[in-house]
């Protein structure tokens, strides 16, 4: 596994070694030993999976302290633009984002540490998306930032008339109206 740093400290891309032959391909998608050596010491306790169609944007979500979550995300089928926004108070990259294309062909994974809002846009007809979390889902601690906050300047790569959102994701505050609880 190769680790690729992004412009925001702590957010890293994992690129596995993929072995291909006439039968197809094989790669190790996760190893605790290698992850802890190269990325972070964390214990994932919950795996989630979602299936979405083209134009769906999920996010930008987070869980408030003390229920914060680090995530390791990947695409099984299809393609997404995966976005992480730094919400850590005092961070030199506060309010900045990383956007990475994750696809069934590139097999990339993205590690998002505590203190980030996370979301993704579906770029393919359909996507099967998986993520590991190091804390359990806690509905009482749900939070979010508005997906199209103009200050974030995220290019979701979906035409406005094709965007599909949940009702909840249309009601999140702008970053400037959010008081960060993340250190």
Language-model features, listed with the residues they occupy:
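Short beta-strand His + acidic residue motifs that chelate non-heme Fe in jelly-roll/DSBH
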Residues: 110, 118-123
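Non-catalytic, conserved peripheral segments adjacent to functional cores
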Residues: 1-105, 124-126, 131-133, 138-183
């Amino acid at each position: 596994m190769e680790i690729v740093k992004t412009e925001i400290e702590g957010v890293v891309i994992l690129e596995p070694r993929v072995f291909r032959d006439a039968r197809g391909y094989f790669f190790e998608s996760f190893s605790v030993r290698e992850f802890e050596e190269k990325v972070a010491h964390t214990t994932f306790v919950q795996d989630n999976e979602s299936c979405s169609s083209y134009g769906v944007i999920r996010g930008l979500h987070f869980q408030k302290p003390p229920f914060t979550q680090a995530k390791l995300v990947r695409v099984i089928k299809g393609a997404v633009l995966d976005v992480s926004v730094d919400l850590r108070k005092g961070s030199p990259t506060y309010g900045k984002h990383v956007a990475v294309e994750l696809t069934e062909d590139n097999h990339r994974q993205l590690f998002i540490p505590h203190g980030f809002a996370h979301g993704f846009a579906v770029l393919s007809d359909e996507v099967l998306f998986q993520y590991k979390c190091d804390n359990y889902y806690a509905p009482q601690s749900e939070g979010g930032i508005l997906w199209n906050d103009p200050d974030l300047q995220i290019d979701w790569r979906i035409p406005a008339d094709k965007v599909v959102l949940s009702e909840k994701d249309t009601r999140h505050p702008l970053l400037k109206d959010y008081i960060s609880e993340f250190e």
